Design a protein with these regions (language model features):
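Conserved SAM-binding loop of SAM-dependent methyltransferases across substrates and taxa
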Residues: 126-138
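C-terminal substrate-binding/active-site "lid" region of AdoMet-derived donor-dependent transferases
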Residues: 197-264
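Conserved class I S-adenosyl-L-methionine
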Residues: 115-125
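Conserved short alpha-helix immediately C-terminal to the canonical SAM/SAH-binding motif I
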Residues: 129, 148-149
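S-adenosyl-L-methionine
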Residues: 2-114, 152-181
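A short SAM/SAH-binding and catalytic strip from SAM-dependent methyltransferases
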Residues: 183-199
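Conserved SAM-binding motif I beta-strand of class I
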Residues: 139-144
């Protein structure tokens, strides 16, 4: 599958970038400037990704750099103020630590390849996964409890004119029937040991009592960090929840995220369906 290879190429390029990165930014990521053999991505979609970064206030600088022969634009930014704000919510599952924009695009593309038609990002941060889903013509919804982050999403929406439907609400309280979903994929924003399991359990229980159960995919972001995983090493820390709720893993892909920039192993995204 094409996106498996693109994901592998991105992981490899990230390692090269990490070795050569001499900046001092709080966060940094790159997006290829144009389509290539390693990144055969629609040029218009690439442009939309650059637009997201250019119009997102968390990034304050960008420059072009060749990484392993591929011309990329590097975006540098700072999420400290958003991070500090995001930890004040009692039921918020995780501080704001986004995935990379290109990782968000690949993750949404994989969901689309399984013929899912709607994407709901739970704990969506600055909305990047929902934004990419909208670019890919999926019906997207971006659910975030933090009002400051939703304000940020609305700024991006206004500037890019891509409406990825940000909703400021507690995902645990939200009534998903309002979205009229038919074949949705839910992305759970939160690592299992940082409250993501509470969020996931709630969503799974809501879905499993409806007709959606047979047509739903749930995607978890995992971790391979031993420090964060006490009891549960497999499936990125999600295996006990996956087993408990009778889910089956249909795909796992590793993608760079802000929190794995300096690590050799990136973040596993685990795609599951109800059995």
């Amino acid at each position: 599958m094409m996106f498996d290879q693109i994901a592998k190429n991105l992981v490899m390029l990230k390692q090269e970038f990490f070795k050569s990165y001499a900046g001092h930014s709080h966060i940094q990521e790159f997006i290829p400037v144009s389509t290539s053999e390693s990144f055969p991505i629609n040029d218009i979609h690439l442009e939309f990704m650059h637009d997201f970064a250019a119009k997102n206030p968390i990034y304050h600088n960008y420059y072009e750099q060749k990484i392993a022969g591929i011309l990329c634009k590097v975006y540098e930014g700072d999420i400290n103020e958003y991070w500090l704000n995001s930890i004040k919510h009692g039921s918020s599952c995780q501080p704001f630590y986004p995935t990379w924009i290109l990782s968000a695009y690949i993750a949404a593309s994989i969901a689309k390849s399984f013929d899912y038609t709607e994407l709901v990002d739970i704990g969506s941060g600055d909305g990047r996964i929902a934004y990419c889903a909208k670019v890919l013509d999926l019906q997207s919804t971006s659910i975030e409890i933090d009002d400051v982050l939703v304000e940020l999403q609305n700024t991006i929406l206004t500037e890019t004119k891509i409406n990825f439907n940000p909703i400021c609400t507690d995902a645990i309280e939200f009534d998903y029937s309002l979205l009229n979903l038919t074949r949705p994929v839910f992305f759970i924003g939160g690592l299992p040991q940082m409250g993501g399991d509470v969020l996931a359990t709630n969503i799974i229980e809501k879905i499993s009592t409806t007709h959606l159960k047979n047509n739903t995919c749930i995607v978890f972001a995992g971790t391979h960090s031993k420090r964060q995983l006490s009891d549960n090493q497999s499936e990125g820390g999600w295996s006990s929840l996956i087993d408990k709720h009778g889910l089956k893993v249909i795909k796992t892909v590793s993608l760079p995220t802000i929190w794995t920039f300096d690590q050799l192993i990136d973040t596993p995204y685990i795609y599951t369906e109800f059995t």
